[in-house]
């Protein structure tokens, strides 16, 4: 069963071997967030690469943005899951990561 963690700023979701199952994000409807999700234990941890490449999401899009096309079993992360978040104009964003 997958767990989840909600972030509103850059940070670690989980440290250690795990599976990434996807994410959703909600915005303030004005300021576009830029998100990168990596196989990394923390800010100074070993980086095994991007799980979700850096992408800017349209804050004016209706509904939630998120990851599609992931394998049903998730993506294996050896080091953990780390999310880098920035928001144009200093707006607000919530990113919920699903993992096991």
What is each of the regions a protein language model found here?
Residues 1-100:
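Surface-exposed, low-hydrophobicity beta-strand/loop segments enriched in small/polar/acidic residues
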